[in-house]
Amino acid sequence: MDNGMLSRFIMTQTLLVFCISMTLSSHFGFSQMPTSSVQDETNDNITIFTRILDGLLDGYDNRLRPGLGERITQVRTDIYVTSFGPVSDTEMEYTIDVFFRQSWKDERLRFKGPMQRLPLNNLLASKIWTPDTFFHNGKKSIAHNMTTPNKLLRLEDDGTLLYTMRLTISAECPMQLEDFPMDAHACPLKFGSYAYPNSEVVYVWTNGSTKSVVVAEDGSRLNQYHLMGQTVGTENISTSTGEYTIMTAHFHLKRKIGYFVIQTYLPCIMTVILSQVSFWLNRESVPARTVFGVTTVLTMTTLSISARNSLPKVAYATAMDWFIAVCYAFVFSALIEFATVNYFTKRGWAWDGKKALEAAKIKKKERELILNKSTNAFTTGKLTHPPNIPKEQPPAGTANAPTVSIKASEEKTAESKKTYNSISKIDKMSRIVFPILFGTFNLVYWATYLNREPVIKGATSPK
């Protein structure tokens, strides 16, 4: 009885273990089936796309443009600016870092598959036809290759291709500097096909004239300019090889004036004011006024030279040149004014001394006449002399005293005519005229240039 119960218990345990093992094995078997099926499906997709690409490139000639002999190839373009600047005034160029996008349709690359878009490796770009785009006003362009070539290529199932690359471009920016430093410029970026005329390849903007060129919010790298906006357009040029379309994007810049106010304008204004301090010094202070005049002239010369160092050597005068020239004229005029005052001061002293000497001579003659009359009256009178005094000898102090007193009075009169610490009439006028003229000039200058809208040739202003 005990043996039977024991055998039943063992059989029950064995059956239970068998059921559990079967359950576990069946569970793990079903859980692995989807994984293997997904892997098989992935491998199948890779195989399909590999066959698609091999089939697309089989017999493909990248030397021929799409639609050759049938239609004009249309290339749609747009630009995303990641970094704008710096701008060089001396070289008249600017640097820009962009994502340059081009899109076109190539019917030879149509495919049918489980996906509508194929993201492709950049190596495939060398095996298919791509537009021969070049930048007309580019001085130097760099295609980034770190860590791999910064290029993107996508293929739609209808044969539409998107080709994007990252470029750093140094381009020419013609500048008209007549209004410098209150000037504005439109720096162009021009590109188009190098070999294909309009009869074969045409370029159009992808998103119209408003959103085809976009600048990142933190993309400005400008210290002396404000980036006011950008506009796009197209140009057509005719050459001996045909008519070509040029895509143009203008970046509108407005110069910041703060740096030049601190470095040039304020020093010039202070130098002119300093030169006018000499009008308030005595005209006899020749050394002090000479130092004022010469120092301010040399200072203005130094400022004019340093102001030109940050500009290209243009043949015309800028707004800053006119300001410096007028300030230089005021400073130089102050020096000439002092020379004039000094000249007339010395001449006035000489003229006053001459008049004093002539007046002294006239008085001397009058006194001699009076003295002669008194002497004659004294000699003709009936005077009795002591016996011990001869008659020929005049009384003591009557003959030499008038002569000595006349000479002393002449010298005192001549010296008294030289009035020191006096104010020249020219200085009085200069104290009023010079500040008024300089203040009027500043009002006219700043009102003219700050309120005038700069004219930019060859570009429309951004809206």
UniProtKB/Swiss-Prot annotation:
From the UniProt annotation, give the residues forming the signal peptide. 1-25
Q: Name one GO cellular component term.
A: cytosol
Name the domain of life.
Eukaryota
Q: Which UniProt keywords apply?
A: Cell membrane, Chloride, Chloride channel, Disulfide bond, Glycoprotein, Ion channel, Ion transport, Isopeptide bond, Ligand-gated ion channel, Membrane, Postsynaptic cell membrane, Receptor, Signal, Synapse, Transmembrane, Transmembrane helix, Transport, Ubl conjugation
Give membrane topology per the record.
Multi-pass membrane protein
Q: Where is this region: Disordered?
A: 387-408
Gene name in the database record: Gabra5
Protein's UniProt name: Gamma-aminobutyric acid receptor subunit alpha-5
> What is a single Pfam family found in this protein's UniProt entry?
Neur_chan_memb
- The segments annotated as topological domain Cytoplasmic are 341-428
Q: Which cysteine pairs make disulfide bonds? A: C173-C187
Q: Which PANTHER family match?
A: NEUROTRANSMITTER GATED ION CHANNEL
Q: InterPro entries this protein is in?
A: GABAA/Glycine_rcpt, GABAAa_rcpt, GABBAa5_rcpt, Gabra-1-6_TM, Neur_chan_lig-bd, Neur_chan_lig-bd_sf, Neur_channel, Neuro-gated_channel_TM_sf
One of the record's GO molecular function terms: GABA-A receptor activity
Q: Which residues lie on this side of the membrane: Extracellular?
A: 26-260
**Cross-link Glycyl lysine isopeptide (Lys-Gly) (interchain with G-Cter in ubiquitin) per UniProt, renumbered positions:** K355
In this chain, 4-aminobutanoate is annotated as bound at: R101, T164
Record: glycosylation sites: N45, N145, N207, N236
Which tissues is this chain's protein expressed in? Expressed in brain, in hippocampal pyramidal neurons.
Q: How does it assemble?
A: Heteropentamer, formed by a combination of alpha (GABRA1-6), beta (GABRB1-3), gamma (GABRG1-3), delta (GABRD), epsilon (GABRE), rho (GABRR1-3), pi (GABRP) and theta (GABRQ) chains, each subunit exhibiting distinct physiological and pharmacological properties.
| Entry similarity comment | Belongs to the ligand-gated ion channel (TC 1.A.9) family. Gamma-aminobutyric acid receptor (TC 1.A.9.5) subfamily. GABRA5 sub-subfamily.
CDD domains cross-referenced by the UniProt entry: LGIC_ECD_GABAAR_A5 (cd19038), LGIC_TM_GABAAR_alpha (cd19052)
| Catalyzed reactions per annotation | chloride(in) = chloride(out)
- What information about domains appears in the record's comments? GABAARs subunits share a common topological structure: a peptide sequence made up of a long extracellular N-terminal, four transmembrane domains, intracellular or cytoplasmic domain located between the third and the fourth transmembrane domains.
- Some GO term, biological process aspect, for this entry: which one? gamma-aminobutyric acid signaling pathway
Coiled coil ranges = none
